[in-house]
Design a protein with these regions (language model features):
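Functionally critical loop-and-helix segments that line ligand-binding/catalytic clefts
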Residues: 2-4, 141-226
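Positions that flank functional sites
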Residues: 30, 59, 129-130, 192
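Alpha-helix boundary/capping detector
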Residues: 41, 70, 140-141, 210
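Substrate-binding cleft of extracellular glycoside hydrolase catalytic domains
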Residues: 2-16, 21, 25-120
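Catalytic domains of cell-wall/extracellular-matrix polysaccharide-remodeling enzymes
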Residues: 84-172
Length: 226
């Protein structure tokens, strides 16, 4: 699942009890630091969940540079994990802003801005329609290709207790897209945990693969079933 200030007060122990393995927490929206990032992180870690982080990337034409935004990400992670960032996760780039749509070059620059701030990039969160509209390239490690893994949002339209409505590991949403099989699939934005509406995400690999993905070491490895 992924959470932000919109789920302030959600006990992530309830998510763990419901069978969730991980929580990806919003660090910031542009330069707006999510005020409950550190508390969500502490709650998730205390509940035994693996923890990831994401940055809602704003186009520079929306008012702040990518470097300024990446600096906020780094400060948020240091507040939650300490100045060395030894145990901090890699950060996902959330590419969905519509005021000024992001380009492939923008996302490559955002990943570099993270690295310059001492933070690893886990990959990109997006939707199929956003990706197609921008005609983004294939994923990979080349200089002009997209960084990291693929976290894809596609909602079949069901709702209910988080995880109960998962369409399954063989659903067409897992099919390869622009040269990559999705590493994570956000399959609903209408899950429910402890009375809170949440986005729910699926991962088909084992615990070691999940840990590697959230640490920024997973792209390019096909997930195993389970």
């Amino acid at each position: 699942m992924d959470v932000s200030e919109w789920q302030d007060g959600l006990p992530l122990s309830a998510a763990a009890a419901a069978g969730h393995r991980f929580a990806i927490v919003r660090a910031c929206d542009g330069t707006y630091a999510d005020p409950v990032f550190a508390s969500h992180v502490a709650d998730a870690r205390g509940a035994g969940l693996r923890v990831g982080a994401y940055w809602y990337v704003r186009h520079p034409l929306e008012g702040t540079s990518l470097r300024e935004q990446a600096g906020v990400v780094a400060r948020q992670l240091r507040a939650a994990w300490g100045p060395s960032l030894d145990d901090a996760p890699a950060v996902w780039l959330d590419a969905e802003t519509v005021a000024h749509r992001l380009s492939a070059d923008d996302l490559v620059a955002a990943a570099r801005a993270l690295e310059d701030a001492g933070v690893a990039c886990a990959g990109t969160y997006t939707t199929r329609s956003y990706w197609r509209l921008r005609r983004f390239p294939a994923f990979g490690d080349g200089a002009d290709e997209m960084p990291g893994g693929l976290w894809l949002a596609q909602w079949p339209g069901t709702a209910g207790p988080a995880g109960a409505d998962y369409p399954g590991d063989d659903h067409r949403a897992w099919r390869p897209f622009r040269g990559r099989t999705p590493d994570l699939w956000q399959f609903t934005d209408r899950g429910s945990v402890a009375g809170f509406t949440v986005d729910v995400d699926a991962f088909r690999g084992d615990e070691g693969e999940l840990a590697a993905l959230l640490a920024g070491r997973g792209p390019g490895t096909e997930p195993s079933g389970g």
